[in-house]
């Protein structure tokens, strides 16, 4: 396996996240939304100049090494108009996106993808955009509600849909390095921890009319990793359906000679079944000695409180839509 190339600086724009938080004080490596929209050209703070929080996640990552910049989109959120509006308000140029990596096949991470591809190709002279997916993402999905009702999820775009909208589809289960080895997209995440058994309410089927089948493990999920020079590896785990401990164990196995610096993403510790895992998750996180834990999206407020109690404010820096994280 090729080494993950260290980058001098990594900038992460939070284009979609569940929460908006402009008023909490933030450490120096996080630029808040108010600052970012004014820097992008807004002349006032208003409803139209700010970002919209929305269930989902979309991250625009720019890796800088010397004079070289590489920009990757990791997920696109649930709905195109909001994602594109947020990027515009933040001054994020999607024409600079050189590749897209999708974490897993859920609507709140892929719903905006076709509109996003249309926008990118309109502004990059029609150049196809590599879009990295895996075959397990394209099943029909659903969840069993607390009422017992089965609620189908919106179908995600198919590989053919993606290609029709300007994607160069890379549909493979294998791990891969992207953009001069600045980004690593994992393969299937081994499920080895004793307590992370997936999402019990989750269902799937191959086509309409077939019976729904239990699908707690959501094996199509992948994580993203970046090595920031003099810090270590930052892991981006969009939903952590594999369990964040399994994600970090795999990262450490793949890159045994590089320390893990931080993790950003949804830890999926919300909902009665998942909240039972919070104590074990806190205990097992200690082994990684992370300097930054950046909960987002589906982490849940109970898990956020537990993280703050266990690791403190210096190490736990929650994500919010419109924020910009800079490492290095």
Placement of each model-derived feature along the sequence:
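Cap/insert and terminal regions of metallo-dependent hydrolase folds
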Residues: 99, 106-110, 210-323
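Zn-dependent metallo-beta-lactamase
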Residues: 1-69, 185-224, 228
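Pre-active-site segment of Zn-dependent metallo-hydrolases
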Residues: 48-55, 63-99, 114-115, 121-123, ...
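Short hydrophobic-aromatic micro-motifs
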Residues: 74, 179-188, 234-237
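Short acidic, glycine/serine/threonine-rich loops at helix termini
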Residues: 25-26, 113, 142-146, 275, ...
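Active-site HxH/HxHxD metal-binding segment of metal-dependent hydrolases
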Residues: 98-169, 187-198, 283-291
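Divalent metal-coordination and catalytic microenvironments
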Residues: 61, 75, 87, 104, ...
């Amino acid at each position: 396996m090729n080494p993950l190339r260290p980058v001098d600086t990594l900038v992460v724009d939070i284009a979609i996240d569940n929460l908006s938080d402009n008023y909490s004080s933030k450490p120096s490596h996080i630029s808040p939304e108010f600052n970012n929209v004014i820097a992008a050209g807004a002349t006032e703070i208003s409803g139209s100049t700010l970002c919209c929080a929305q269930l989902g996640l979309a991250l625009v990552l720019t890796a800088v090494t010397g004079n070289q910049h590489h920009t990757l989109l990791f997920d696109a959120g649930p709905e195109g108009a909001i994602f594109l509006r947020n990027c515009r308000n933040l001054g994020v140029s999607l024409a600079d996106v050189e590749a897209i990596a999708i974490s897993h096949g859920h609507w709140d991470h892929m719903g905006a993808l076709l509109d996003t591809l249309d926008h990118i190709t309109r502004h990059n002279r029609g150049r196809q955009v590599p879009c990295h997916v895996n075959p397990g993402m394209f099943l029909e999905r659903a969840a069993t509600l607390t009422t017992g009702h089965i609620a189908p999820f919106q179908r995600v775009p198919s590989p053919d849909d993606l290609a029709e909208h300007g994607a160069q589809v890379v549909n493979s289960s294998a791990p891969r390095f992207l953009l001069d080895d600045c980004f690593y997209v994992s393969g299937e995440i081994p499920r080895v921890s004793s307590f992370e058994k997936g999402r019990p309410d989750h269902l799937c089927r191959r086509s309409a009319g077939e019976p729904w089948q239990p699908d707690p493990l959501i094996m199509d999920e992948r994580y993203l990793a970046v090595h920031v020079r003099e810090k270590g590896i930052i892991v981006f785990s969009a939903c952590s359906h594999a369990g964040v401990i399994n994600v970090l164990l795999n990262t450490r196995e793949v890159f045994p000679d590089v320390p893990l610096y931080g993790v950003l993403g949804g830890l999926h510790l919300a909902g009665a079944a998942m909240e039972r895992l919070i104590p074990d998750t806190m205990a097992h996180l200690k082994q990684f000695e992370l300097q930054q834990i950046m909960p987002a999206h589906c982490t849940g407020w109970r898990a956020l409180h537990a993280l703050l109690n266990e690791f403190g404010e210096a190490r736990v820096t929650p994500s919010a839509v419109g924020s910009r994280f800079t490492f290095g």
